[in-house]
Amino acid sequence: MTTGSVLPLLLLGLSGALRAHREDLTVREACKAGFSEEGYTALISPNVLEGEKLLKVEFSSCVGTKGMQYETNSLDFKVGADGTVFATRELKIPSEQVAFTVTARERQSAEQWAAMVRLLVAQTSSAHSEHKKGQTVALDPSQPPNDTLLPWPQHQSSGGLRRQKRDWVIPPINVPENSRGPFPQQLVRIRSDKDNDIPIRYSITGVGADQPPMEVFNIDSMSGRMYVTRPMDREERASYHLRAHAVDMNGNKVENPIDLYIYVIDMNDNRPEFINQVYNGSVDEGSKPGTYVMTVTANDADDSTTANGMVRYRIVTQTPQSPSQNMFTINSETGDIVTVAAGLDREKVQQYTVIVQATDMEGNLNYGLSNTATAIITVTDVNDNPPEFTTSTFAGEVPENRIETVVANLTVMDRDQPHSPNWNAVYRIISGDPSGHFSVRTDPVTNEGMVTVVKAVDYELNRAFMLTVMVSNQAPLASGIQMSFQSTAGVTISVTDVNEAPYFPSNHKLIRLEEGVPAGTALTTFSAVDPDRFMQQAVRYSKLSDPANWLHINTSNGQITTAAILDRESLYTKNNVYEATFLAADNGIPPASGTGTLQIYLIDINDNAPQLLPKEAQICERPGLNAINITAADADMDPNIGPYVFELPFIPTTVRKNWTITRLNGDYAQLSLRILYLEAGVYDVPIIVTDSGNPPLSNTSVIKVKVCPCDENGDCTTVGAVAAAGLGTGAIVAILICIVILLIMVLLFVVWMKRREKERHTKQLLIDPEDDVRDNILKYDEEGGGEEDQDYDLSQLQQPEAMEHVLSKTPGVRRVDERPVGAEPQYPVRPVVPHPGDIGDFINEGLRAADNDPTAPPYDSLLVFDYEGSGSTAGSVSSLNSSSSGDQDYDYLNDWGPRFKKLADMYGGGEED
């Protein structure tokens, strides 16, 4: 066959294939796949056997049912390849119905369809059962599809009594969530058997009808068909409880209300949600397989009793995939993550990131919904790496006598987690330091070992130390881990020589000797030792502290001699011990010195005579009423003190004549009068006191005795107690003089204050506050309210320049702005008021002076104010020149009389009287 004949055949075959493909596409576009019904209902027995066929669902597919797969959301039921629904196990159904969803899935396109299956439990009597078990419910042909009829419970009357027959058990109504409608979608139809006789109106009440959420369900009042008006959401509300009512057209109740239970059938519309998006856990390195790490949890809002809410877990990825890509596994049901492989090593991988997936539908990845979370697993450190020294030997150097000095740093390496007990190093000297001169402390930052001198070393004894140090961790090593040979190192420490100070071997040195040894007496040799035996240095001595300057030291050999007499009773002696400090210095470079203390215990000798106590006393002038107790004080110590001997001297003879001493004990005696009466006064009584030293010392002391008259109780009745108290006559006189001076000063101050007060009152009476124009605003009388005198001659105000001089006329109308040209009247000089406080006399005197003043206007005289007119000599005010007060002459104020004396004094410079 040629090529020309084959080509037309190929084109013809291709054309036919294209035509067949177009026809197949046309058929598919005209075909609509899906279940024959949106819901199936069947009656079943309460007891269902395993494998029992319950009903059959029909599915129409445009490509045939060969590639279809059926599933249910219930583990109790399965669907065969032909659509037959059967039980997977023996069931005892306690409720009135069972509802579940059947899903048809196309394997190639993964497209799926769902239908609701309701299995009603047959619990009614045979008289009311119109269906056979195992068959799909046959509906009334007059009813629309899915018009499930729920008859009202019937009643029967007998003999006038109304008996209710056994009611229908109204099965729950199941509504799948997320239905696409169309809405309203019919659920069931309810009817009463009385609707054949009378018209009946139906209604429903309850949550979802007339209670929020409102109008989720409604009912056709005439036909009784109940509808759902919108898609349901089981996660929002899983069930509804309604009540159905039947009334006639007048609203009268025809039937008792019945309960309707509506259950929302769950659909797989919610993904599992993890409680946390990131989980943190930890596991020890080196853990064995099966070690628990952490638990992740995801919740699904769908029904947990169905596959929609059954969540399963799995690990999606692990990062890093070292040493194995599957180091962990997860329990699919509980979410527990455990190790599945060995080899966890923190020093290699410190952290793993694991992506965990949660899938519902029991983990079916084809049908279930999934979600993911992150699990961060930290590998925690264990002490599986012993610390190791970076080198096997270390060296250091330290001067002798130096402490708390770091002489060497020991470095270690530890691969465990820094700054943890598994990393922190602990150092221990295991040999080479029997005397404990060194310790090794750990630097908390670098983890180094610091070899520190804690006890001074001596170059003359040890010139070097060879230490062996071992290092470990604060935490013990993990099981099976052994210490490394590199955990031990040697440390060589060299000691360098320094110039050490001389020291006194016996420091403090104590010697005992009697006080009073003469100057120049050798006491002891206080020598020092130079520890630098190999330097052959000379030591010189000197005094550092000698408070009383009693001692001398030989600068070469340290011999100490006395430079003065040692006195135990001196203020420089404390508790019989005199203390001095000496200095020993070598001639090294640089020089070094040491100090030593010498303590001299002074043994007491009887070198102090006793002193009589008290120095003053008083006694009654007649004997027998009282006596004076006397004793003695001695600066020495026992046995150079008491018992004391008290006696009166023979000279003067009056002492033994007037006084007598009675011994009480070794320390006390009584001094009393020997005669019957001794005149009052102060007497000096000498008394000889002798101690018990060897040899004994005596002292004659004088006691001042105040002899005074006494009352029946033996107490002095004079002021002698003052003197006895320590106040002499001079002191008393001085106190009295001070008191008198103080009283005089107070009196003078009171007199001065009285005089000042009188002067202030006098000034106030002589000066009217309104007349004092200094620094005050002048107040002039106001002429308001009209003129009192209305009968004066107005012609006096006309042409005042033509009038005769007012001074030549008798007192009447006069000018008050001119100084009178006549002779000034002579006023009587006011006598000095002997008592300025007498206000009445002062006022009367002023009144008489005013009455005798010829220039004083009468009370009812007419005051004529100037009318300047054209002939005024004042001119313009602007012609006035300002001038200082120094340019003015105020002497004329002295001519105005005593009434203006204060003003004249103010402006004329006069002094106030």
Swiss-Prot record:
Topology term for the membrane: Single-pass type I membrane protein
Keyword Nuclease among record annotations: no
Glycan attachment positions: N146, N280, N409, N554, N629, N658, N699
SUPFAM superfamilies the UniProt entry points to: Cadherin-like (SSF49313)
Extracellular side: 167-731
Pfam families named among the record's database cross-references: CADH_Y-type_LIR, Cadherin, Cadherin_pro
Propeptide residues according to the Swiss-Prot or TrEMBL record: 21-166
Tissue: Distributed widely in mouse tissues with high levels present in brain, skeletal muscle and thymus.
Gene Ontology molecular-function annotations: calcium ion binding
Domain notes: Three calcium ions are usually bound at the interface of each cadherin domain and rigidify the connections, imparting a strong curvature to the full-length ectodomain.
PANTHER family named among the record's database cross-references: CADHERIN-23, CADHERIN-4
Its biological purpose: Cadherins are calcium-dependent cell adhesion proteins. They preferentially interact with themselves in a homophilic manner in connecting cells; cadherins may thus contribute to the sorting of heterogeneous cell types. May play an important role in retinal development.
Stated name of the protein: Cadherin-4
Gene that this sequence comes from: Cdh4
